[in-house]
Swiss-Prot record:
Designated gene of the protein: rpsK
GO cellular component term, pick one: ribonucleoprotein complex
Source taxon at top rank: Bacteria
Lineage: Bacteria, Pseudomonadati, Pseudomonadota, Alphaproteobacteria, Hyphomicrobiales
SUPFAM superfamilies in the record: Translational machinery components
A GO term, aspect molecular function: rRNA binding
Species of provenance: Bartonella quintana (strain Toulouse) (Rochalimaea quintana)
GO BP annotations listed: translation
Keyword tRNA-binding (UniProt): no
Keyword Nucleus in annotation: no
Keywords per UniProt: Ribonucleoprotein, Ribosomal protein, RNA-binding, rRNA-binding
Protein name: Small ribosomal subunit protein uS11
C-alpha cells in the first residue's frame, strides 16, 4: 500500500503583541522559549539547536545566538513587548536577556523563577578536580 504524502504545514502568522520569554539556563545549555499570555509556545530555540556542541553550548555567546534566533521568530508573529522569566544558574542568563533587548523588544518585567529548595533533596556531591 502506498504511503500518503506528508504535507508540510506552513506556520500561520499570529498577531500577538505581548508575550512571556522563558530563559532556562543550565550549566550545560540555554533554552529560550517565547509564549503568549496563556502559555502557548510561539517560538523556541536553544544553544544546541543553533549548532553548538559540547561545552560550547554553555557559553554566554551561545545563549545570545539562541535568544536572537528566538526573537526573530517571535517578531515574525508581530510581537512587540515581553515579560522575562529567568530560571537556572547557568552562564547564559544575562547575555540572552541583553540579546532580547537589542533585538528591539520592550521588556516590561524581569522575574527570577529559579526554584530554591527549603532544605529539600540532598544535593549532589562536590566535584573534585
Amino acid at each position: 500500500m502506498a504511503k500518503q504524502a506528508t504535507r508540510v504545514r506552513r506556520r500561520e502568522r499570529k498577531n500577538i503583541l505581548s508575550g512571556v520569554v522563558h530563559i532556562n539556563s543550565t550549566f550545560n545549555n540555554t533554552m529560550v522559549t517565547i509564549t503568549d499570555a496563556q502559555g502557548n509556545a510561539i517560538a523556541w530555540s536553544s544553544a544546541g539547536a543553533q549548532g553548538f556542541k559540547g561545552s560550547r553550548k554553555s557559553t554566554p555567546f551561545a545563549a545570545q545566538v539562541a535568544a536572537e534566533d528566538c526573537a526573530r521568530k517571535a517578531q515574525e508573529h508581530g510581537m512587540r513587548s515581553l515579560e522575562v522569566e529567568v530560571c537556572g544558574p547557568g552562564a547564559g542568563r544575562e547575555s540572552a536577556l541583553r540579546a532580547l533587548q537589542s533585538a528591539g523588544f520592550v521588556i516590561t518585567s524581569i522575574r527570577d523563577v529559579t526554584p530554591i529548595p527549603h532544605n529539600g533533596c540532598r544535593p549532589r556531591k562536590r566535584r573534585r578536580v
